[in-house]
């Protein structure tokens, strides 16, 4: 199979990368009706598989799960997930032939094998659904021409898909139809009904493309969403320990600080996050973030380039073929870092203290979001897609760090995201350690400025505020957040 994106000419590539339209709520007036009375069979019952299935069933759809016979015989976790929630479970041979829509929600590395197995069993004119387009775009999977291929991609982990639905809301979602597989012209109707069945239409749906979803998703998760949190946690912890800050306090400041800081992002963007700082701290965070952007821009652009060309995917798939030797080795190394093993403490850190003593963390967030957004849009990805794959998802990923440090983040994200995270963090960590952290002190990470006055020059503050507010990620973010007025706090235990 050849990389699908690389088979397109330049005009086609740019067209696919630039597909993104915020759909009007009126386009979902019939909600999930198009799929009612039809048989939906989900392959895979992990976090996305189970929670999307629960939502779809509650929306009136006929949902069952097709699992490998071995998973059924051995009653593996996927089987238990489905059966304990009252779903019908059967083998591929039992359920796939009667399915009108087969939804493949298995891990990326299993997609080729799964699709090659189920496709011969699918009835003529059925539809095949994905929630991530890697198999189509990067692996170039060829789907039978009578099959309609669609995507519904919620922009958050599966557990959040369910929780937001239960609140009567939903999560922002991308939908797409594969241009090579829409024989009856009803791909969009299928995708719209599926998205509505998960509740996504209540939070906002972007009509996108398989290409735009994959390229932007890979870029976001490798850099700001995961890689920057991992690299930042490691180097900031090292700095605080080296300068005599208590290990328990240092670890807690980072583990829970990312979540607290990025929650401000979710509600008011970078502007609101920076406004949580005192004026002197805001100016300092701005200066640090400008330095970070200059230092890290080449690394962000390199990752974007490798994603666009397919170099990243081919490298990762080679590791798949080698029994994940690199992935597993990097996972073990991460588990041995000092931050992952800091001693638990019962020290209480008030919310504002995470900002006051985490000025560098704020700077890293601002720099990382803007760099990822800029790299994506410079490559032809439209601003709405770039926003969702950078700023919007960051609080959700930071929440996983708050639960069980980097281990939890890497467990929750896909293997594809985890592999890309390590590629980025393995370069970003020594880069920050050697070229940046030597010039900062614990006044920006761990202790705070300790200023006695909030005074800064008017001219400086005006420049800082105007620069922050005029960045394209802030402008598009303000518009998109307007569609999500019913957001909840994501903090652990809240």
UniProtKB/Swiss-Prot annotation:
Binds 2 magnesium ions per subunit. Residues 14-208 form the KARI N-terminal Rossmann domain. GO terms for cellular component: cytosol. Disulfide bonds: none annotated. Residues 209-344, 345-487 form the KARI C-terminal knotted domain. The keyword Repeat applies. Mg(2+) 2 binds at residues 217, 389, 393. Substrate binds at residue 414. One of its GO terms (biological process) is L-valine biosynthetic process. Its EC number is 1.1.1.86. HAMAP family: IlvC. Involved in the biosynthesis of branched-chain amino acids (BCAA). Catalyzes an alkyl-migration followed by a ketol-acid reduction of (S)-2-acetolactate (S2AL) to yield (R)-2,3-dihydroxy-isovalerate. In the isomerase reaction, S2AL is rearranged via a Mg-dependent methyl migration to produce 3-hydroxy-3-methyl-2-ketobutyrate (HMKB). In the reductase reaction, this 2-ketoacid undergoes a metal-dependent reduction by NADPH to yield (R)-2,3-dihydroxy-isovalerate. This is Ketol-acid reductoisomerase (NADP(+)).
